[in-house]
Amino acid sequence: MKNKIYFASPFFNPEQVEREERLKAKLRDLGFEVFSPKEAYFCKPDEGDEVRQMVFDGNCKAIQECDILFAVTDGKDMGTIWEAGYANGINSVVYPSKKKIIVYYCETLPEGGKFNLMLAQSGDIIITDYDDMDQLPNLIKSGEVKKYHGKIE
């Protein structure tokens, strides 16, 4: 059975969209089943309350049902950070027996750069280089954590 990934990422400019598509393709190539909220639900900026609630509920349900939350933290998108916090809250309070693996991807973090304290502490696996993506299946299968130990902000 494939591990189900909830793919949290900003997608508001061409660079973000390119990174999102590249990473989703890589995760699928690595054998993961990838849920993309952008592909499943799309909410226009002027959408009414009913559609907004449907999108919100659908995304929350998908986070609850995933095995892994993969969050692209480049750009510090508020929605992505909220999704990661929700997954961490589920781990802590709601479903502690079915712990989700939280992976943060930050390719724009410079060597020696500062990573957010809350993300550093809640992430099970931190990836800062695209080439390290190939390690992800083995890290998940082994249960190994790859925490961030650099400077924090």
Segments predicted by a language model, with ranges:
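Conserved catalytic or regulatory cores that recognize and/or transform ribose-phosphate-containing ligands
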Residues: 1-153
